[in-house]
Amino acid sequence: MIVALLGFAGCATPAVGDPCLPEQVPEGGFQQTEAYIESSSVQCQTRVCMVYKLEGAPEGTPTCVADRTKCATAEQVDKAVYCTCRCDAGNSRFANCTCPSGYTCTPVLEQGSEGVRGSYCVKSFSVSAAE
């Protein structure tokens, strides 16, 4: 019976919300009107690192080092850059996750390959602020 319960507990959404930093930061930093998905992120148990509507570049990245006016604060990065999972892949053959409490399944990518298109778990306060 314990094995069955442990197996069920393993189905929870792993590490959504954990901090991460994408390996690639666009020249000039991120744009607040965009969301960025880095799949195959080794920093995330979910393998997906998302930048959701962040303006600028995280501290220590080449863009921020070259131009301090392009830097995002640590608080801004904490709110907008984190591990996530895809919660709705549409009619795709790919699996979906269930968003944990405090996150909303939100359409993020409408273009791109079938492997990344769809909705992702986004911090609920970010979705409310955008509406």
Model-based region annotation:
Residues C11-E131:
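Secreted, cysteine-rich disulfide-bonded mini-domains of extracellular proteins
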